[in-house]
Structure formats: C-alpha cells, structure tokens
From Swiss-Prot:
Key enzyme in heme biosynthesis. Catalyzes the oxidative decarboxylation of propionic acid side chains of rings A and B of coproporphyrinogen III. Belongs to the aerobic coproporphyrinogen-III oxidase family. Pfam families: Coprogen_oxidas (PF01218). It is found in: Plastid, Chloroplast. Its EC number is 1.3.3.3. This is Coproporphyrinogen-III oxidase 2, chloroplastic. Keywords: Chlorophyll biosynthesis, Chloroplast, Heme biosynthesis, Oxidoreductase, Plastid, Porphyrin biosynthesis, Transit peptide. GO terms for cellular component: chloroplast stroma; cytosol. It comes from Arabidopsis thaliana. InterPro entries: Coprogen_oxidase_aer, Coprogen_oxidase_aer_sf. It is an enzyme of class 1 (oxidoreductase).
Length: 233
C-alpha cells in the first residue's frame, strides 16, 4: 500500500509543501528545513503526522473534499477549498491536453486514489514520448494533523501560540517535465493552498491559511534566449 510523505520548507516569507508517494509501510512525516542559521537540534525537525493510507479508485470523484466540510461551508462551490481544488484539477487537464497535443500519439496514464477520511488525488504519467522522455502532472487534496511543535517551527511562532494538535488541509498541483532533447530544459512547477483549523483543545481559534508555489526550469545547456523567454512569460 502506498503511503504519503510531505516535506515543508520555510523561508522568512514563504512556507512550502511538497508531496510525494512511496511504496513503503513506514510512518508518514513532515520534514522542516530552515534556510537560515538555527541551533542544530532544530535544523531538521521531523514529526509524525496523522495521514491515512491511500485507496486506489477506478474513476475520478467529483470532489476530494470531505462531506463533513459541508457543515462548515468548506465544501460549498464558493469556499476557498472547493475553488482551489477546481482550479488545480482544471490546470492539470489543460497541461496534459497541451502535452498530448505536442506528442501526437502518446497519452498520459492516470491513477486516482483517495483516503477513507477524506482527500485524495490524481496522478498522471507520460513516458517514452516523441517529445517528452517522462512527464508527470499531479494533483492532491490532503487532510491531516500537524503536531504543535511543527506548526510553531514552520511559522516561527512563540511557544505560547497554537497549543494542541493542529488539523490541517492542503491542496496542490505539481509537475516535472523531462524532454527527450538534451538541449531543452527540464521544467518543474508546483502551486498549493495550505490551511490550519483551530487546535483541538482551542475550539473557535482563528484559522490560518496561505498560498505558495513557483515555476522553474533546469537547463543542461544554458541558452540566454531561453532564459529571457522563461522570465518574460
């Protein structure tokens, strides 16, 4: 059974979530890496989080949001969660359609998965294509519980803030595109929305939320015109 791991990176102005899958039965972790100088014991803070195992699905659901979110109007079509999920799933469709149009033949293979407690994702892979050696375009919707120490470390909060386990919601899309042509750069992007609920022992506390993301390309051979084009679009 596949498990889910997530890595969070912080900077003075950002808080970034990267998600991956691994075929192991080991615990799920959040790993925090701090770019600025901090005391060694806190440089790499690894904490277990409550994330359920994935279940393969035969078809895509209308939404990966929890039904119980409706009690808090979180699953309504106007909520940020629902709007962001719709946006990343639309983006996945458009990116895959554009890649397949260039390929003129090879198609993406799709895996859909969910979790009993809510959340899930769609993974699409194309490999050995005419243009792309391998292309992956994924979306995921995740629910979990963040230890208070992890939240404080990520947000540089004081020890008095956010007591108790912190329920969280995260949704995002990510992609890595490797072309066959070595003179063409590898492209990567990821965009996500992260939200924490009130701590379990402090009901009614304010919800925290933020967006993050970025796009980059990694050339094996640098061409100045490629760099200029990338930064102009």
């Amino acid at each position: 059974m596949a498990s889910h791991s997530s890595t969070l990176f912080t900077s003075p102005s950002s808080f970034i979530l990267f998600s991956s899958h691994r075929l192991k039965s080991s615990p799920n972790y959040f790993t925090y890496h701090f770019p600025r100088s901090v005391k060694r014991p806190h440089f790499d803070l690894r904490c277990s989080v409550s994330i359920e195992k994935e279940v393969p699905e035969t078809e895509r659901p209308f939404t990966f949001l929890r039904v119980s979110d409706g009690d808090q109007t979180q699953s309504s079509s106007y909520s940020v969660r629902a709007r962001f999920e719709k946006m990343i799933r639309t983006a996945q469709d458009k990116v895959c359609e554009a890649i397949e149009a260039v390929e003129e033949g090879p198609k993406f293979k799709e895996d859909v998965w969910s979790r009993p407690g809510g959340g899930g994702g769609i993974s699409r892979i194309l490999q050995d294509g005419n243009v792309w050696e391998k292309a992956g375009v994924n979306v995921s919707v995740i629910y979990g519980v963040m230890p208070p120490e992890a939240y404080r470390a990520a947000k540089a909060a004081t020890s008095e803030q956010k007591p108790g386990p912190i329920p969280f919601f995260a949704a995002g899309t990510s992609s890595v595109l490797h072309p066959q042509n070595p003179f063409a750069p590898t492209l990567h992007f990821n965009y996500r929305y992260f939200e924490t609920d009130a701590p379990k022992d402090v009901p009614g506390a304010p919800r925290q939320w933020w967006f993050g993301g970025g796009t980059d390309f990694t050339p094996a051979y640098i061409f100045e015109e490629d760099v200029k084009h990338f930064h102009s679009v």
